[in-house]
Amino acid sequence: MNIKPEEITSIIKKEIEKYEKDIKTVDSGTIIQIGDGVSRVYGLDNCMQGELLEFPNNVYGMVLNLEQDNVGCVLLGEEKGIKEGDTVKGTGRVVEVPVGEAMIGRVVNALGEPIDGKGPISTSQTRAIEIPAAGIIDRSSVNEPLQTGIKAIDSMIPIGRGQRELIIGDRQTGKTAIAIDTILNQKGKDVICIYVAIGQKQSTVAHIFNTLTEMGAMDYSIVVSATASESAPLQYMAPYSGCTIGEYFMHQGKDVLIIYDDLSKHATAYRAMSLLLKRPPGREAYPGDVFYIHSRLLERAAKLSKELGGGSITALPIIETQAGDVTAYIPTNVISITDGQIFLESDLFNAGQRPAVNAGISVSRVGGSAQIKAMKQVSGTLRLELAQYRELEAFSQFGSDLDADSSRRLEKGKRLVEVLKQDQYSPLEVGKQIIILYAAVNDFLSDIKVSDIKRFEKEFLEYVDTHHREIEKSIITGKTLTDEIKSMLEEAIVEFKKIFLQEA
């Protein structure tokens, strides 16, 4: 057998040409310090802010500090088994969460992983948790109402789709109750609701989930949970993850309602992380950029322009105050970022006025332009009349004799306060709210005892529903109170009052 040297060389050449060697370069570093959920890594020269790092034992970390010779990062899992000297790899990716229709009805953690025991979430799409907010050109003004189903709010502090309205008050004043009622009221209104629990007890989150399930609200809701037992980095990430999940739906042209419960605990988690990363503390030991963590989150709530599909995110952040002090650092920060606040007072709550909304210092800066005309017509004088009532009430406690006009205002105020009371988990449709508020504002309840107002409201709305259904229909379709609707409504009130007073 003759083997020609040329043939051998050509075969070798072909083999060499075919050979491809993939060189994989990995940016890696060494742990020089670890503890308290925080690590310092040396040698990651090409690292970026917010990058995911891969630690041993399949644990990930997020870069927050870029320093001259090392990077500071927070761990997103257990630090058990990880020690100084271990190798850490850079991934070149930032933190992302899964998004999509499959998220609806699920309970997920801050990383978007399911924690409700219903199996994996079937979605392949992911989005980064930190995305710049929509620009001025991409937005349109707030012009559609988002009904909460709560009379005191929809009448005096209206909320529009795309607005950011702060709910602020001491602990145990009904802040979460308002948020949950608002979610329940979105049933059948094509609004996706996201409830973000930050630093709450696990039992509280379980109770909220059970309530939403029983009321059929989980069909259009998502719960993002980072409870008190989870690490500070996960509590810090939760609202951004919730917002990213909501932005997916907003860009589909849908309306989203997102509740952050609460941002006080979010700031506390960020403070803990910052102090462990040895960032210089400022006022109340918060780091200097604590304003920015909330502003960049809440600026992502928007009403998009028609060209971008006209979707919206309405944000209801919650802040817990200490003894009604709204001048503390975090409350003043969030008040200045949002488009208004609903202020809840423990004194009103303890006096039996629930929801305990203080109409005097609560305000909605943009919601008025989204309120329907019929509601504007009935609630125009409501805030003023309540303010006058509060003043007269304080004055009348001294026992001095009041003139007839003051007595009339005092009696009317008592009835208005009674009408604005509402049970939890019983949101009212806007048409029904307008009907009962019209009766209260226009002095039709002056001959009804204050103790009977609640029963009168319930029975009157049932009466209108069975005998005069066209009134509510006309209000909802026309969105304004014409003279014709007013006369129909007044007739119905007079008719029912005769029946009610005879029974009484």
Swiss-Prot record:
It comes from the Bacteria. ATP binds at residues 169-176. Its EC number is 7.1.2.2. GO terms for cellular component: plasma membrane; proton-transporting ATP synthase complex. The keyword Isomerase does not apply. It is found in: Cell membrane. One of its GO terms (molecular function) is proton-transporting ATP synthase activity, rotational mechanism. Its main location: membrane. It is an enzyme of class 7 (translocase). The record marks 362 as: Required for activity. Pfam families: ATP-synt_ab, ATP-synt_ab_C, ATP-synt_ab_N. Keywords: ATP synthesis, ATP-binding, Cell membrane, CF(1), Hydrogen ion transport, Ion transport, Membrane, Nucleotide-binding, Translocase, Transport. It catalyses: ATP + H2O + 4 H(+)(in) = ADP + phosphate + 5 H(+)(out). SUPFAM superfamilies: C-terminal domain of alpha and beta subunits of F1 ATP synthase, N-terminal domain of alpha and beta subunits of F1 ATP synthase, P-loop containing nucleoside triphosphate hydrolases. The keyword Oxidoreductase does not apply. It is a peripheral membrane protein. PANTHER family: ATP SYNTHASE SUBUNIT ALPHA, MITOCHONDRIAL. Belongs to the ATPase alpha/beta chains family. F-type ATPases have 2 components, CF(1) - the catalytic core - and CF(0) - the membrane proton channel. CF(1) has five subunits: alpha(3), beta(3), gamma(1), delta(1), epsilon(1). CF(0) has three main subunits: a(1), b(2) and c(9-12). The alpha and beta chains form an alternating ring which encloses part of the gamma chain. CF(1) is attached to CF(0) by a central stalk formed by the gamma and epsilon chains, while a peripheral stalk is formed by the delta and b chains. Produces ATP from ADP in the presence of a proton gradient across the membrane. The alpha chain is a regulatory subunit. This is ATP synthase subunit alpha. It comes from Clostridium beijerinckii (strain ATCC 51743 / NCIMB 8052).
